[in-house]
Structure formats: structure tokens, C-alpha cells
């Protein structure tokens, strides 16, 4: 793991200057952890190490606007694949072998996320960019959705900014955005329901905070800082609290997972702080690799910032920043097997969609495997649930097709044993308990 630990204190100065410029997953003592479907929340590793399997199929196609894939898995194992730009969803009830008809849904369009509440079985999407904060909820594994009001509480730094006169931006169409800020969930990975530790049952999802202190800056003037953060709910989605900001600015489109000891691992895209992209690369030579941090308090604060040189931040076509990547933890008892996805072309074209595996909770990433060599951009990952048709498989939903990165979305299904036949990265070793 590469990087330097950084203090979060400069964030206060940067943001203020810019503008002054418990529910729980069902479990009783001694009993197995179960979801609302009565299925185990976690199981053995062996099911992911069966005979290597790989297949792939197109789920959405169209012109040049097949953008922003979101993937979630309901407690019964139903897969939900969302095409964000078109507010469309397709479901698979047989582990990704076949996909149902396209459903028009209200949960997408440039501000989307999905969170599966394993205790209640509901699937939720929090929308906070356009007008009043809203929550969309499905009680039938994504077939239908209802709209609810929800409350999103600001964190302490946001309150400080509001005291200086900053106001929440309420419509995306505002031309004069100076002196405003907004939260959004654009291009973040699916949220999680915490299973372990003091905050078990908490719903947690990544988000982004964007301030607008001034009009569009000049090419060599810093843009307004963008900060990854998270939203968490301890009441099933009725109210949400904004976490502290990620310990580095110019970050967004992030992903998070819970580790087996209850810690939260946060992995974020890096976003350019300058409109002059050559200037951005000169000042931030590590622009095209991922950032990571951890939380020991259920996602409220973040610490131990690191720059992850082994994980590319995808292709930016020379623009000095990365793109949305996928992240999931396999539901394995007592182990932290993580899978990450992105284009293996840091800073170059958006091609070579690849997956990486970690067996020690993101300390090392010793193996990777190419999934799709042609065009490939944003991606999303989930792992199959024990006791369902999805069990033992990993699912990658990504932008990409033979005619371009944004002309199709495909779902690849594969086993961990398939990844293990890939390329060693030199960043740590695959442990014996995996290879046995």
C-alpha cells in the first residue's frame, strides 16, 4: 500500500476560504447472520472457487449515450442493472443468465444510487440534487418504486459554510451557481447495510459534495474543490446524515465496502482540480490512480488516506483525471476478499476493462485479469448472495462495446477461480488459504 497519511484539518480552511470566499440484520446470539429473505448474509469461500466460469452479454445498447451503469443485488439474489442516463432498469432472477424487459424507473438521471437494506429487504435510492431531497423505495426487488420524503442532515463543515451565507443549490439548471453547494450521488457504487460491529444495520452509501464559490475559473485557476463523502441512515432510510469529507479534495464517484471487522474501506476516483488538464497533470502526477481511506466509526469519519499506485483510475483521454470504478466484497465469513474494476489504462483511452482481487482488505492487490480489451469505461460490481441463484459468482456491469465505450452496457459473470488464472501484479501474494 503506497501513500502518505494526511490530516483532514486543511479541508476546513479550504472549504471556508472557498465560500468566504438501530435496525440490524437479523441475528440472535449464536445464530447465523440472515437477510430478510431468510438466506445467510455470508457464507464459505469455496463457492467462489469452483470450476472457473466466465460469460458476458449485452444488457443495454443504443447510440452514443449508453452511460453510467449501476448494479445492485436484492436479498433474494435478483440482480438490478440500471442505465442511469435513460432512467432504465433490467432485472435478472436467475443469476444473470437471462434479463427481463426494460423498466422505466424514477431513480436515475445523473443523480443515482442504490442501497439494499438487508434487514427489511427494501432497495432504496436517495436523490438530493434536483429540488427537494427524495427517497425512492422498492419493496418487490426492483419491480416497482414509490417516492418518499427524506431528510438529509449536513455535516459540521457544511453548517459552517451555511453560516457564511452559502446556500444549497436546488436545481441543476441554475446558471449562476456562485455561493451555492450541492450534494449528489452521481456515479457512486451501490451502498451497503452494515453487518458487523457497533453500527450493524446502518445503511451507508458514497456521495459527493460540490461547492460553487465563483463563476467558471480561468484555465489555470483552481476549480472549486470536490469532496467524496458518505450518507448514513440508522432508521431505515427515513433520515440521513452526511459524513465528514474524504481526507483529500478533488475526489468523487467513489465506492465503499464493510470489512469483516466492521471497518469501512473507501475507494475514490481522483478528479482534476484545474480546467487546464496539462497543468493538472503537472501539479498532481498521481492524478490517475485511486485514493483510499478507512472508517472505524461506521462511516462517519475517514482517516489514513493513501494513494493506491497499483489500482489505475481508468482512462481520462489525457484530461488529467480518472473515472468511476467498481468495488465489492465477497460475502465470505471472516475474510476480506475485495474485487475492484476499472480500465487498465491510467490516463489513456478508456479501454481494457479489468478486475483486480485483494485478499487482505485492500492492503495488497496481487492478481488482476482482463475482462474486455476494446472500449470500456464506467463499471459497477456486485457479488452473488449465498443460497440464491447468484451464489458463487461475481458480476461486472460496464460501459463498452465494439463500437465505442458509450454504445453498449454489458454484464460479465465470473468466478474468483477465473480471476486467479490471471496476471500477478507484484503487489503482494495470493494466500495459501485461497490456492489450496
Predicted regions and their residues:
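Asp-box/BNR beta-propeller blade signature and adjacent active/binding-site loops
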Residues: 25-436
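Intrinsically disordered low-complexity regions specifically enriched for long asparagine
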Residues: 10-11, 32
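N-terminal secretory signal peptides that target proteins for export/translocation
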Residues: 1-8
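Serine residues within intrinsically disordered or low-complexity segments
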Residues: 7, 22-24
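Bacterial N-terminal signal peptides
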Residues: 12-22
Amino acid at each position: 500500500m503506497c501513500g502518505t497519511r494526511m490530516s483532514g484539518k486543511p479541508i476546513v480552511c479550504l472549504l471556508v476560504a472557498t465560500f468566504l470566499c438501530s435496525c440490524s440484520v437479523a441475528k440472535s446470539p449464536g445464530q447465523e447472520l440472515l437477510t430478510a429473505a431468510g438466506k445467510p448474509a455470508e457464507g464459505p469461500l469455496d463457492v467462489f472457487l469452483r470450476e472457473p466460469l466466465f460469460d458476458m452479454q449485452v444488457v443495454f445498447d443504443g447510440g452514443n449515450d449508453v452511460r453510467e451503469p449501476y448494479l445492485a443485488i436484492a436479498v433474494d439474489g435478483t440482480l438490478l442493472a440500471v442505465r442511469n442516463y435513460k432512467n432504465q432498469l433490467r432485472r435478472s432472477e436467475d443469476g444473470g443468465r437471462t434479463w427481463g424487459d426494460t423498466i422505466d424507473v424514477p431513480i436515475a438521471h445523473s443523480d443515482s444510487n442504490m442501497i439494499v437494506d438487508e434487514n427489511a429487504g427494501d432497495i432504496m435510492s436517495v436523490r438530493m440534487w434536483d429540488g427537494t431531497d427524495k427517497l425512492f423505495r422498492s419493496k418487490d426487488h426492483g419491480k416497482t418504486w414509490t417516492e418518499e420524503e427524506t431528510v438529509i442532515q449536513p455535516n459540521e463543515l457544511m453548517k459552517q459554510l451555511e453560516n457564511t451565507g452559502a446556500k444549497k443549490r436546488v436545481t441543476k439548471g441554475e446558471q449562476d451557481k456562485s455561493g451555492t453547494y450541492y450534494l449528489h450521488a452521481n456515479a457512486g457504487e451501490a451502498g451497503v447495510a452494515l453487518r458487523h460491529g457497533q453500527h450493524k444495520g446502518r445503511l451507508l452509501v458514497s456521495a459527493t459534495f460540490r461547492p460553487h464559490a465563483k463563476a467558471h475559473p480561468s484555465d489555470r485557476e483552481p476549480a472549486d474543490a470536490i469532496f467524496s463523502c458518505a450518507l448514513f441512515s440508522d432508521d431505515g432510510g427515513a433520515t440521513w446524515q452526511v459524513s465528514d469529507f474524504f481526507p483529500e479534495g478533488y475526489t468523487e464517484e467513489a465506492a465503499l465496502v464493510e470489512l469483516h471487522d466492521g471497518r469501512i474501506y473507501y475507494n475514490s476516483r481522483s478528479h482534476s482540480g484545474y480546467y487546464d488538464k496539462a497543468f493538472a497533470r503537472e501539479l498532481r502526477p498521481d492524478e490517475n490512480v485511486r485514493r483510499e481511506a478507512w472508517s472505524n466509526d461506521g462511516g462517519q469519519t475517514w482517516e489514513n488516506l493513501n494513494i493506491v499506485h497499483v489500482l489505475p483510475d481508468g482512462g481520462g483521454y489525457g484530461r488529467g483525471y480518472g473515472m468511476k470504478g467498481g468495488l465489492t466484497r465477497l460475502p465470505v465469513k471472516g475474510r476480506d476478499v475485495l474485487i475492484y474494476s476499472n480500465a487498465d489504462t491510467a490516463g489513456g483511452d478508456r479501454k481494457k476493462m479489468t478486475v483486480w482481487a485483494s485478499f487482505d482488505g485492500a492492503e495488497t492487490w496481487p492478481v488482476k485479469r482482463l475482462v474486455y480489451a476494446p472500449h470500456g469505461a464506467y463499471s459497477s460490481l456486485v457479488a452473488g448472495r449465498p443460497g440464491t441463484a447468484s451464489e458463487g459468482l461475481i458480476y461486472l456491469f460496464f460501459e463498452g462495446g465494439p463500437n465505442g465505450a458509450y454504445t453498449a452496457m454489458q454484464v460479465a459473470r465470473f468466478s474468483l477461480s477465473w480471476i486467479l488464472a490471471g496476471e500477478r501484479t507484484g503487489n503482494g501474494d495470493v494466500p495459501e488459504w485461497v490456492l489450496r
